[in-house]
Amino acid sequence: MRLSIRAIVLFALVWIGLLMSGYGVLVGSKVNAAGLVLQCHYLTARGTSTAQYLHTNSGIIGFSDCPIFRKIATVVDNG
């Protein structure tokens, strides 16, 4: 019982943190368009967001992997 309450409280704190900061957490990625486009899916407090980056294996010109966190345009508190 205590474990489930702690898990719910932890989830609520993480959700509020994502809502106030405007960041998203990486939940999935895939390479498409003949290996030139890296498509990253982020979970935010308001839903999901998709970002597309130029993909290269070296990471010099584009991205080799998706960033774990991404700033989303809509923020609840701009204080």
UniProtKB/Swiss-Prot annotation:
Keywords: Signal. It comes from the Bacteria. It holds the Pfam family YobH. Residues 1-33 form the signal peptide. This is Uncharacterized protein YobH. The gene is yobH.
